[in-house]
């Protein structure tokens, strides 16, 4: 009987290998198991998400059956014009161009489904392309403008964008060539969807036509609106170094401010400076452009010598008459008669020769506040003599009532308020009163008024207070009312 033999060496090595694997498994399993679980979980969630999104889109299509071209792209802001080559194409107020995916049935942004995150492409079409009709894909293809032979692509920059919840932003795009060589001499921008979607057609968006100029022309472009300190050739129909520009420079009209100032001072003379080469239509275009200039709110007040006291003209930074200050009342320009407007314009011309006598305010409100609330003892406000003004005429502005309210709040009776004013201007009005009444055939008021004035002045010089103080002011107010009536009669306003 033969005794079997065993290769204990090989079996021992097998046992060692098994033990080694068990050891590796013991150490690696705690590390690998969480990692594998995480990877599997992410893949499952991703697949499940795609599956659910597809189910949602199918449900939406079943609930709201989609028709051909049921969605459309639309530019959400206008292009900023003019457009120059190599310059960034911008929307209103320098913003990036924004495109929205619109549901025409609601007019709202379509922000659900795969189409709301589709890829967009910007392209160029002919300026005479009919963007009103319901164009076809073939119409678009036939009107796309390509670059000229040997030139760079017509659009430079990132011509692709992606919708985010139905809105896309087209940024950093510029033209490399002008539009003068095309059949319409204009371009339109278009945007279309690059991706294709089942059962869905999306209409392209097309802008209005516009001219693309060479960037060298940007140095000579007009400003809309112009600035007061822009050179005058920035106005429409006035070319740089052209005939109109030279004529204006010879008359020392160098800026838009100069142009507007001369227009308000003497429009017919300004028209003569430009000459017959500027037609009436061109003149209106230039003038409308100049008038679109944004002016500051400052106002300027001036009382010209030789005019009635208590009368001053109010004008703005370009010498336009805003109104008159007459007898402590502000009369806006639209309420002035033609004669008063002519007088006001003469006063403005005189003011420009006496700028040191012009008083400026931030706006009309601050002007009225300074004029109406100025202390009576000043005798003069904004260069206007108000020394003879009766306080009753201020009641319409709430001045007297506020004065009494102030006295009451401070614990004083209104009779105790010091309202001492020396009515110098009153004598001047009185001196002219007899002549006025005599010419008009009115009864001579001299004796009665003289008596009232003498009584007032005698009380003024005496040390009288309280009710007597109020009584003599009442008399003065009555006299002032008489003077107002006779003054209005003299001016023919009654």
From Swiss-Prot:
Tissue specificity remark: Expressed in stems, flowers and root.
Keyword field: Activator, Calmodulin-binding, DNA-binding, Nucleus, Transcription, Transcription regulation
Source superkingdom: Eukaryota
GO annotation terms (biological process): negative regulation of defense response to bacterium
GO molecular function: calmodulin binding; DNA binding
Methyltransferase is among the record's keywords: no
Record's keyword annotation contains Cell wall biogenesis/degradation: no
Annotated segments matching region DNA-binding: 132-252
GO cellular component, one term: nucleus
Stretches for region Calmodulin-binding: 1-62
First-listed, main subcellular location of the protein, grouped into a coarse class: nucleus
Compartment annotation: Nucleus
Subunit structure: Interacts with calmodulin (CaM).
Entry similarity comment: Belongs to the plant ACBP60 protein family.
Stated role: Transcription activator that binds DNA in a sequence-specific manner, likely 5'-GAAATTTTGG-3', to promote the expression of target genes.
Protein's name according to its UniProt entry: Calmodulin-binding protein 60 A
Organism for this UniProt entry: Arabidopsis thaliana (Mouse-ear cress)
Gene: CBP60A
């Amino acid at each position: 009987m033969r005794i079997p033999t065993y290769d204990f060496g090989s079996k021992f090595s097998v046992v060692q290998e098994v033990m080694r694997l068990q050891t590796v498994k013991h150490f690696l399993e705690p590390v690998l198991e969480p990692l594998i679980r995480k990877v599997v979980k992410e893949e499952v969630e991703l697949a499940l998400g795609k599956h659910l999104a597809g189910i949602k889109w199918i449900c939406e299509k079943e609930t709201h059956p989609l028709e051909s071209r049921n969605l459309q792209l639309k530019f959400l802001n206008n292009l900023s014009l003019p457009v120059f080559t190599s310059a960034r194409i911008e929307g209103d107020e320098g913003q990036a161009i924004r495109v929205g995916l619109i549901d025409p049935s609601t007019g709202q942004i379509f922000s659900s489904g795969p189409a709301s995150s589709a890829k967009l492409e910007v392209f160029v079409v002919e300026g005479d392309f009919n963007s009103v009709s319901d164009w076809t894909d073939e119409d678009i293809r036939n009107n796309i403008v390509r670059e000229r032979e040997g030139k760079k692509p017509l659009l430079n920059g990132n011509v692709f964008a992606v919708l985010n919840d139905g809105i896309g932003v087209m940024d950093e795009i510029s033209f490399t060539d002008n539009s003068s060589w095309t059949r319409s001499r204009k371009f339109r921008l278009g945007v279309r969807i690059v991706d294709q979607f089942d059962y869905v057609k999306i209409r392209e968006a097309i802008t209005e036509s516009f001219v693309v100029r060479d960037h060298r022309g940007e140095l000579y472009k007009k400003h809309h609106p112009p600035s007061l300190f822009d050179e005058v050739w920035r106005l429409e129909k006035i070319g740089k170094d052209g005939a109109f520009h030279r004529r204006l420079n010879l008359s020392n009209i160098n800026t838009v401010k100069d142009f507007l100032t001369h227009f308000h001072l003497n429009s017919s003379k300004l028209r003569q400076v430009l000459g017959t080469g500027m037609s009436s239509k061109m003149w209106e275009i230039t003038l409308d452009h100049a008038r679109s200039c944004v002016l500051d709110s400052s106002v300027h007040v001036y009382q010209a010598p030789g005019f009635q006291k208590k009368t001053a003209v109010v004008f703005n930074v370009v010498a336009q008459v805003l109104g008159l200050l007459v007898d402590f009342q502000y009369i806006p320009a639209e309420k002035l008669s033609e004669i008063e407007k002519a007088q006001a314009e003469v006063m403005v011309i005189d003011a420009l020769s006496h700028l040191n006598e012009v008083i400026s305010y931030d706006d009309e409100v601050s002007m009225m506040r300074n004029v109406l609330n100025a202390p009576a003892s000043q005798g003069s406000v904004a260069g206007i003599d108000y020394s003879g003004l009766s306080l009753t005429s201020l009641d319409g502005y709430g001045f007297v009532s506020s004065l009494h309210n102030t006295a009451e709040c401070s614990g004083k009776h209104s009779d105790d308020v010091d309202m001492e004013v020396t009515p110098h201007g009153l004598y001047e009005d009185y001196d002219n009163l007899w002549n006025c009444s005599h010419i008009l055939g009115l009864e001579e008021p001299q004796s009665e008024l003289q008596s009232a004035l003498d009584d007032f002045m005698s009380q003024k010089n005496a040390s009288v207070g309280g009710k007597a103080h109020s009584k003599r002011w009442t008399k003065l107010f009555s006299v002032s009312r008489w003077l107002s009536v006779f003054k209005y009669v003299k001016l023919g306003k009654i």
